[in-house]
Amino acid sequence: MPIYFSKKILLGFTTGLCLQICTLSANANSTFTVRSLGLQKCEQLVGAMQGETESQAVVLYSQWMAGYLTAKNASLGVLDVFPIRDPLGEWVRFVTLVCAGNMNKTLAEVLEGSVSALADYRETDASAETLELVDGEHKIRVYKNYLIRMQQHLNGRGFKVDSIGRFDESTKRAFLEYKKSNNIVGPALPDSLFLVFVLSQGKTQ
């Protein structure tokens, strides 16, 4: 079954979602079990992530999705299927956003569909260069190829970027203007919200 990348879903989310990757141990008395998380419906994941405080469910979901990403990279023989290297919470946020548009599907279905949708963004070069992108207090580390692709996407939609492959002021300004024009919240970075929006539009340049 196909999954959907919804533009409208982004309007209901903010960067304040409780999506930290945690290293806490799971409580042995939890009603959640790691084996069953993939069978949980997306509505359960989204509900947990929209909580005001970090819960044990959030910890387990985050750890499970982190493990899934590591295993998928290994099984496909690629460096990374997700173009945002750090923080890992961006991967969790990405999956949660996709789940929000596919509430009746299982987490496993959405993860598999997301990996397929991200096929063009996979990094296969073990020595691929990464760049730290900073906007105020916000920062992410991405693969350079991903930044280039997103800069080309911006240029193709009339948001001028001067230096392809560098995160200069023209790039930051273009990301900010693009997000504002499309009602996407968050810093002037190609973060998970930006990526979901781009995927919702189909193929990029």
Q: Can you describe what each PLM-predicted range is?
A:
Residues G12-C22:
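Bacterial N-terminal signal peptides
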Residues N27-Q205:
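Cell-envelope/ECM-targeting effectors and their regulatory/trafficking segments
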